[in-house]
Amino acid sequence: MAAIIAVASQSGGDFVAAGVEEFGKVEVVGDSLPEFSDAAIDPAIGVMAPVLTGQGFTGNSVVTSPGAPTLLVFLAHWCGFCQREVPLLVKWNSAGEVPVGLDVVAITTSTDPASPNFPPSEWLAREKFPPLWPVMTDSGEKTAATAFGVSGFPFFVLLDAEGKVALRLSGGVETGVLTEQINQALTRTN
C-alpha cells in the first residue's frame, strides 16, 4: 500500500535554504476529482484518480502512479489541525501501525511565506516526518490540491492499487480511526 502526504503552498519558485524548494511544478494527468463536501456519499469514490508528477523539497521526483494502495496526505504549514496531525502520523509510523503494504505520500500545499510555521520543509524536519514517506511540494496555484478536490486541511485521499479513490477525509483524524477507515475502504474495493 502507498500513502501520499501533501503540504500546501501559495507561491512558486521560492527557495528557503540552499537546495530546498518550497514550491514545485505539478503535472496532472487525468480528470480532476470533484471538490469534497460533507455529503453522505462522496462522488469521487470508485473514480480513477489523476496521476500527479512533481518534486520534493530537494528536487527529487515524486509520482502518484497506481500499483499499490496509497494514502495521499495534503498538509498546510499554517494549519493548526495539520500541526496536530503530523506528530500523530509520525507516531503512527514509528509504532508500526500503518497498514501493511500502504504507501504514504505527503503533499505540502497552500504554502504562504507570510504565514506561521513557514517553511514547510523545516516544519516537517522538526517533526521528524518519516524519511521513507515522499513529500511533494505543490505549486503556488495549488495544482495538486485542486486536482484532488481538497476542501480543508489536513486532507486524506486513499487510492486503491488500481489508482481509484477508495476514501477521502478532511480534518484531523485520530490514527486508530484512520487505520480502521483505510482497512474498511480497501476491503470494499477488493
Language-model regions: role of each:
Residues 83-128, 136-146:
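Structural microenvironment flanking redox-active thiols in thiol-disulfide oxidoreductases
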Residues 43, 56-57, 159-160:
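Short, acidic, Ser/Thr-enriched surface-loop or helix-capping motifs
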Residues 66, 129-131, 137-187:
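Thiol/disulfide oxidoreductase modules built on the thioredoxin-like
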Residues 61-83, 89:
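Short active-site neighborhood of thiol/selenol oxidoreductases, capturing the structured segment around
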Residues 46-70:
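A short beta-strand-turn-helix
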Residues 71-72, 104, 156:
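Hydrophobic beta-strand anchors of alpha/beta hydrolase catalytic cores
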